[in-house]
Amino acid sequence: MGTIDEDMRRVVEEQRLGYAATVCPDATPNLSPKGTTAVWDDNHLVFADIRSPRTVENLRHNPAIEVNVVDPISRKGCRFKGTGTVLAEGTLFDEALAFYRRRGVANEIRAVVLVQVGRAMPLTSPAYDLGATEQEVRERWERHHEALRKGESGAPTGE
C-alpha cells in the first residue's frame, strides 16, 4: 500500500484545488493555489506549471513541498509532505501533459511538478474536536456559501 490512501485520493480527485507551500531562496514561505492538483499514483501527486514561476523556481533550489487539499464544505482534507521534482520534458512529462489534456486543461503547460509524498496526514476543522458531526459542519458551511451567493455576509463562527 502506498502513502496516499483511498480516502485521500477521493478528496484530491473531488477538490482538485491544492495549496502548495514551498521555501523561497531567502527562507521565507511561498503558498500558491494549484487548480490542477491530482493523484499520480499511490505515492505521488502532480500539478501543472501553468502560472507557477515562483513555485517552480523555489523547487529548483529546495525540493521541500507541502500540499494541502481541503473540502471547504466538510472542512476535512489532507496534508501531503514531500519533495517536488520539476519536469519540463521526457516521458513522464508527456504522460502528464496527455493526462491534463484529457481533463480538458487547455492552458499552456510549461512543466509539471511530481510530488513524492513522504508523509500524508488528514486535516480536520477544530469543530470536530468539539463534537460536531460532518453533517452539522456541512450544513453550517452550505448555509454560509448560500448566503454569499445571495450577497449576504457573515461567516459561521468557531472554526
For each predicted feature, which ranges?
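Short, structured beta-strand-loop surface elements
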Residues: 17, 54-99
